[in-house]
Amino acid sequence: MVRFCSATLGLLLLAAAAQAQDDKLDTKMALSGERLFRTYCGACHGKAAKGDGPLAKDLKVAPADLTRLSEKNNGAFPFQMVTETIDHGRNVRGHGSQDMPAWGDAFKSTSQTPDEPKRMMRELAHYLWSLQPK
């Protein structure tokens, strides 16, 4: 029982530490996220993340302007919603018969470590956070 409680407490502390890291913008993560954004997101969302990428015109629904996420969330950056959308995709019908890609699956299939996909999604979210008007 003591081992179980110790293990559970350890996991809770790790989760709390990871959550605390996302309470404020991390510029180092944002810089890494910019590279990922250009690789995975820019074709649809555009270089400036305004939804005007070169593939946007081919979609039924225009990609979101990702520079307005905080504005649409009462001034707070919706970090968890962003990482969940990156991970699981989004039910948007702009991709014809497909929804927005679930990048979490793509990241998992190419990752060297189990933690890498989550880190990549967090880096992307920090980058998008850095694009929000102050």
Report each predicted region and the residues it spans.
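The canonical Cys-X-X-Cys-His
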Residues: G33, F37-K47, M100, L124, ...
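Extracytoplasmic electron-transfer domains, predominantly the class I c-type cytochrome c fold
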Residues: D58-L124, L128
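Positively charged n-region of N-terminal signal peptides that target proteins for export
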Residues: M1-F4
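Bacterial N-terminal signal peptides
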Residues: S6-A16
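Electrostatic cytochrome c docking/interface patches
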Residues: A18-L36, K72-N74
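Detector for the c-type heme attachment site
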Residues: C44-G51, D105, W129, P133
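Short beta-strand/turn micro-motifs at beta-sheet edges
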Residues: D52-A56
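Sequence context surrounding c-type heme c attachment/ligation sites in exported
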Residues: L31-T39, P114-D115, P133-K134
